[in-house]
Amino acid sequence: MSAPSSPRVTRIAPSPTGDPHVGTAYIGLFNHTLARQSGGRFILRVEDTDRNRYVPDSEKRIFQMMQWLNLTPDESPLQGGPNGPYRQSERFDLYGDYARQLVQSGHAYYAFETSDELAALREEAQKAGHVIAIPSRDLGAAQAQARVDAGEPAVIRLKVDRDGETVVNDLLRDPIHFANKEIDDKVLLKADGFPTYHLANVVDDRLMQVTHVVRAEEWITSTPIHVLLYRAFGWPEPVFAHMPLLRNADKSKISKRKNPTSVEWYQNQGFLPEAMLNFLATMGWTHPDGQEIFDLAEFERVFRLEDVTLGGPVFDLAKLRWYNGKYLREVLSEDDVARRLHAFLMQNKVTLPSVDGPQDPYFRAVTHLMIPRLEVFADFMDKTLYFWSEDYPVNEKAQKAIDAGKELLPELAARLKNLPTFDAASIKEMFHAYAEEKGLKMGKVMPPIRAAVAGTMESPDLPEMLEALGRERVLARVEKAAR
């Protein structure tokens, strides 16, 4: 795909109100890609004006999420940049100035209604079937200014023309028409000087030179307000593109009641950031060549925003696990898997007896055996306990296999003991020779050994597993099971 003719400036603007959300990662991926494709800039702005919902460590965790995903912004509160500050709470003076500028130009007005008066006005408007009418809208400019100068509490509201319509042009949709009579006069600046989302969002996007506003489709209903603000200021509108929301399997909006929504949960489960990005890239978009597995560089090479579809992509955890397993088996080298797996286990304070690092021969042997059977790193210890401890459980199915083949175990133990070399090829050859000699099928010979040494019938290739465990450990377990 040829590079866009002009650099795109994109942004994400999360609010630090809780766990770093998978939806932020999703929107961040597409904004990051659009900027990188064009040699533009990707901005991370923190919208922290809602102090009631503010969570102190949330901002730090958002940065950590973006770093983990390798979606590094060019400008943010961490890096700084030419258009900072990048926290809205540090830009309050700007918003007040711009709100008053709109009052002076006649596109906004001071409003003095109390909360009780507003409640009554809303009830009246609801009964009449129209938007709330604000009496202060009809005050003369001098009269309103005099009340402000006298210290009377006031908000600043957008003055929406009651005639005509406002059209939102969205790159992913046909033009969306909103009747102006159905758009209420939104508060832009609160009485305490705090801006609302609408004012701060538009002012920041303009001052940070954002060219493309790519965000979730839940913001479509706010966009006519933003369009009206751009027009009131005399500023050109950015390109708007509202991405489809991530959905649960029942097509409801993704929520933590049905799917984990915190990216930290996926990190703690041992998902790979590359697999997460690959999966998120397929949410509403398909590779033009039908590829399912591709890296961030390939996504940047072929992605076109116009190709996003709006069908409501399903965030399928089983599919994400499938992607992660594919990366473990087909994309990363075994060295890389071992290194990352060892780091994951150390981070989670898992003790591996006698393992001194990711290159430890025994750890590497176990990793080699388990890669085909892993989807996420968190599964590793549950699936490999018998490699690390003699105190491993024997499940019901395995116990039945031991009981059914108990008379074979002493002879098999003796033959394993007498093998000249204890490697997978020799072990496999011994099993076949024993089965042929006794007139048994391999399905009778191998299960009791597997059950005895692993406590489960779900384990890797048996000869390779026995070689990794070593002769001494295998014989002790088989002899114990035979008693």
From Swiss-Prot:
GO molecular function: ATP binding; glutamate-tRNA ligase activity; tRNA binding; zinc ion binding
One annotated GO biological process: glutamyl-tRNA aminoacylation
InterPro entries: aa-tRNA-synth_I_cd-bd (IPR045462), aa-tRNA-synth_I_codon-bd_sub2 (IPR020751), aa-tRNA-synth_I_CS (IPR001412), aa_tRNA-synth_I_cd-bd_sf (IPR008925), Glu-tRNA-ligase_bac/mito (IPR004527), Glu/Gln-tRNA-synth (IPR000924), Glu/Gln-tRNA-synth_Ib_cat-dom (IPR020058), GluQ/Sye (IPR049940)
EC numbers for this chain: 6.1.1.17
Subcellular location: Cytoplasm
Record-listed ATP binding positions: 256
Keywords: Aminoacyl-tRNA synthetase, ATP-binding, Cytoplasm, Ligase, Nucleotide-binding, Protein biosynthesis
Record keyword Ligase present: yes
Keyword Protein biosynthesis among UniProt keywords: yes
Pfam families xrefs: Anticodon_2, tRNA-synt_1c
Cellular component annotations (GO), alphabetically ordered: cytosol
Chief place where the protein resides: cytoplasm
Superkingdom field: Bacteria
Motif ('KMSKS' region): 253-257
Motif 'HIGH' region: positions: 14-24
Function in brief: Catalyzes the attachment of glutamate to tRNA(Glu) in a two-step reaction: glutamate is first activated by ATP to form Glu-AMP and then transferred to the acceptor end of tRNA(Glu).
Annotated family: Belongs to the class-I aminoacyl-tRNA synthetase family. Glutamate--tRNA ligase type 1 subfamily.
Protein name: Glutamate--tRNA ligase
UniProt organism field: Deinococcus radiodurans (strain ATCC 13939 / DSM 20539 / JCM 16871 / CCUG 27074 / LMG 4051 / NBRC 15346 / NCIMB 9279 / VKM B-1422 / R1)
Record lineage: Bacteria, Thermotogati, Deinococcota, Deinococci, Deinococcales
